[in-house]
Amino acid sequence: MIYTKTGDKGTTSLIGGTRVSKDDIRLDAYGTFDELSAFVAVLGDSEGVEAHEIEVMDRIQNCLLVLESCLALDSQQSTVNSQQSRVPRLTEDDVKFLEDEIDAINAQLEPLKYLIVPGGNILSSRAHVCRTVCRRAERNLVRMGGEYDVDDVLRRFVNRLSDYFFVLSRLFMKQACVAEKPWGSGCSTGQGSTPLGDRLRSL
């Protein structure tokens, strides 16, 4: 059955069986990655995305499911050891995979000289949505890490993932022959400087 009614009072189960409130930071963390996966699906299903990028996003979605499983594991539960052995893990190979993809895309792009304003191409804009949702998911992951153990590999993977969507957004603009919109154009602030742009992008 799709519905169990066990969550009707605002609680749900972690892997291990512990019941927690649905506003628990762990649910907020893995729920945001689930949201991110849905946005990745929208991007991957969009017309004009090339086969290689679709393959990369398929792998990313699988990695996100692994990540969600890790976050849903109750590390404080006494039965966790038996559960833990059956939960897949992200590895350094997954981080390296993203780094290689980032480097390959970045090699095709002009050096970044200013802060970019999203917009101008639907694929690029959808990649920016993925990037910003990923950053929100990362903030939840950091908050979760203040109360529970979070594997450093997960942190690195998520940090690289937002960078991947950033360079992908730029690649889509290049492929569409659309000029990137620099921050400050048409605004009283003036052109965004390179140091400021780099600083804001790295937040």
Q: What is each model feature region?
A:
Residues 1-203:
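Phosphate/pyrophosphate-binding loop motifs in nucleotide- or prenyl diphosphate-using proteins
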